[in-house]
């Protein structure tokens, strides 16, 4: 089976925060799981280096857009690597390859008659002497009356045009823009109305899109899909490949989602492999992003794929809700965020991955609290999982000289482990990652109870053979926990496998156990709860 996984492309205009990771982490869990199953996986993403936010940030700082993009693209790569993300291709939208691929997509849509020219009115800033596309205009959403950008309202998810906004202001200078006529290319989105409607009916029946994606897309379809501009007067981006229009750029909403396609083609060129299997109707496709990106993946990208004759429309949309921080809405402008480069300096990446999975905003907004983060690490990772692994392996080291005693796997435990692979796998495939991880940790707590009830410290004196059986079965559980937890907690899983000299990562019960263990080290360290006050103080600016 061919599995294509696309992670949303973060704007390279500032550091990643935990809100980004909360929405993107499911992609890596899926990729690791399907690879362990032996499936053919292509997992791609990249940095959005062409968007308006980069141009605005560059102008504000008095540097080039390229300098801003380079800085954050490199930082993103480090953060994703340090968090254990296993992209097969992580690229950038200002690469020559991406530009060429997107231009081919544009020309194909033009040739098929899905793109046409139209004279329209557009916001124009007299002070900056330039047209103001999408995010260059800010104001009030006409639907919910919350603050919004010219491309979309985060509060109600409405897709907007800058002229839709009330109380419009130029993002660069704050002046009120005028309205001027200009010519742009438009995508005939309305022609895909019935096809998109059919797609939504199918995924709703199968339950393969998150509810928020289904509900929002149903709303768009009910209102009637509207044609959208595919060109903008932007300083950076992919140039329109039509003579006389080279100064205009392909609008980011079509250019960015086409990044999945360009990354796939780039991977194929780099590896010498064929990527077409990921774009046919048999491919299982997963698109992983936050709810603010739903319309781009549930309406626009399927329409583009249909327009260029590709069959692999989004089978699964994994669109998480928002993550708040200490009960407040995350705000990068107010520095109310937990920044990824910062948290990685002091905390285990598996602790971050664990918390953002068991507290994932899968169906509703959830909160990141430093108190809950640190207590979950100490009680679950250290107190439950780490404790079971450490007490078992230290017992072997102390009483058996590092030699794993011989024994046979208890039928009850074997059945339990086989059931875990089945149920956890099903939950992952259904994008219920929280359920999957909680199911494993229920088994971890069962394992600790098993150890306590068997009392190997007493068995060693009273019944040495039973003690060996107990420890052998505990090693069996540990080996399989490492396998089962690998998609979620790859770093600690690798440490366990190294200690047990286990190489295989297949998604199936690990029945062959090692004869000895090497260098037992604590799987996790306790975090001092005094850190809670320190971290919250930093967030409020009281601590530097």
From Swiss-Prot:
> What residues bind ATP, as annotated?
332
Question: For Zn(2+), which residues are the binding ones?
Answer: 141, 144, 153, 156
EC main group: ligase
Q: Name the cofactor(s) required for activity, per the record.
A: Zn(2+)
Residues spanned by motif 'HIGH' region: 10-20
Q: What keywords sit in the KW lines?
A: Aminoacyl-tRNA synthetase, ATP-binding, Cytoplasm, Ligase, Metal-binding, Nucleotide-binding, Protein biosynthesis, Zinc
The record's section on SUPFAM superfamilies has: Anticodon-binding domain of a subclass of class I aminoacyl-tRNA synthetases, Methionyl-tRNA synthetase (MetRS), Zn-domain, Nucleotidylyl transferase
Q: What is its EC number?
A: 6.1.1.10
UniProt GO cellular component terms: cytosol
Catalytic activity from the UniProt record: tRNA(Met) + L-methionine + ATP = L-methionyl-tRNA(Met) + AMP + diphosphate
Subcellular location field:
Cytoplasm
A molecular function GO annotation: methionine-tRNA ligase activity
Q: Does the keyword section mention tRNA-binding?
A: no
Which NCBIfam families does UniProt cross-reference here?
metG
Describe the task this protein carries out.
Answer: Is required not only for elongation of protein synthesis but also for the initiation of all mRNA translation through initiator tRNA(fMet) aminoacylation.
Family, according to the entry, reads as follows: Belongs to the class-I aminoacyl-tRNA synthetase family. MetG type 1 subfamily.
PANTHER family annotated for this entry? METHIONINE--TRNA LIGASE, METHIONINE--TRNA LIGASE, CYTOPLASMIC
Q: What is this protein called?
A: Methionine--tRNA ligase
């Amino acid at each position: 089976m061919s599995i294509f996984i696309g992670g949303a492309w973060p704007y390279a205009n500032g550091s990643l925060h935990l809100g980004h990771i909360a929405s993107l982490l499911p992609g890596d869990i899926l990729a690791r799981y399907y690879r362990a199953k032996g499936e053919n996986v292509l997992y791609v993403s990249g940095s959005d280096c062409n968007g308006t936010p980069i141009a605005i940030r560059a102008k504000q700082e008095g540097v080039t857009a390229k300098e801003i993009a380079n800085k954050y693209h490199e930082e993103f790569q480090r953060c994703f690597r340090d968090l254990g993300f296993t992209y097969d291709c992580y690229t950038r939208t200002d690469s020559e390859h991406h530009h060429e691929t997107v231009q081919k997509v544009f020309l194909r849509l033009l040739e098929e008659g899905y793109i046409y020219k139209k004279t329209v009115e557009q916001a124009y800033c007299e002070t900056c002497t330039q047209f103001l596309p999408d995010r260059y205009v800010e104001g009030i959403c006409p639907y919910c009356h919350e603050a919004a950008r010219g491309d979309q309202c985060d509060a109600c998810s409405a897709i907007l045009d800058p002229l839709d906004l009330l109380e419009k202001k130029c993002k660069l200078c704050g002046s009120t823009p005028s309205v001027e006529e200009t010519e742009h290319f438009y995508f005939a989105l309305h022609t895909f109305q019935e096809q998109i409607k059919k797609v939504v009916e199918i995924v709703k029946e199968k339950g393969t899109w998150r509810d928020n994606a289904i509900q929002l897309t149903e709303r768009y379809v009910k209102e009637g899909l509207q044609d959208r501009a595919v060109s903008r007067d932007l300083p950076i981006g992919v140039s329109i490949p039509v003579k006389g229009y080279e100064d205009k750029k392909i609008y980011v909403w079509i250019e960015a989602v086409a990044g999945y396609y360009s990354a796939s083609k780039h991977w194929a060129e780099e590896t010498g492999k064929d990527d077409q299997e990921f774009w046919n109707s048999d491919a299982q496709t997963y698109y992983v992003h936050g709810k603010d990106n739903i319309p781009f993946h549930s309406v626009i990208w399927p329409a583009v794929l249909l327009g260029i004759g590709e069959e692999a429309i989004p089978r699964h949309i994994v669109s998480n809700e928002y993550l708040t921080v200490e009960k407040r809405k995350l705000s990068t402008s107010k520095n109310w965020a937990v920044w990824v480069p910062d948290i990685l300096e002091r905390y285990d990446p598996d602790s971050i991955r664990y918390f953002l999975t068991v507290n994932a905003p899968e169906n509703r907004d959830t909160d990141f609290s430093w108190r809950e983060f640190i207590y979950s690490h100490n009680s679950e990772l250290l107190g439950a999982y780490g404790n079971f692994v450490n007490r078992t392996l230290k017992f072997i080291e102390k009483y058996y000289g590092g030699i794993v005693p011989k024994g046979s796997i208890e039928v009850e435990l074997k059945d339990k482990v086989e059931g875990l692979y089945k149920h956890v796998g099903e939950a992952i495939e259904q994008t219920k990652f929280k359920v999957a991880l909680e199911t494993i940790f229920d088994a971890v707590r069962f394992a600790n109870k098993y150890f306590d009830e068997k009392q190997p410290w007493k068995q060693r004196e009273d019944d040495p053979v039973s003690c060996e059986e107990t420890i052998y079965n505990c090693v069996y559980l540990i080996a399989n926990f490492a396998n089962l937890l690998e998609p979620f907690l790859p770093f600690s899983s690798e440490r366990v496998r190294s200690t047990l000299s286990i190489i295989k990562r297949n998604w199936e019960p690990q029945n062959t156990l090692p004869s000895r263990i090497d260098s037992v080290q604590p799987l996790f360290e306790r975090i001092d709860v005094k850190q809670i006050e320190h971290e919250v103080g930093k967030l409020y600016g009281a601590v530097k």
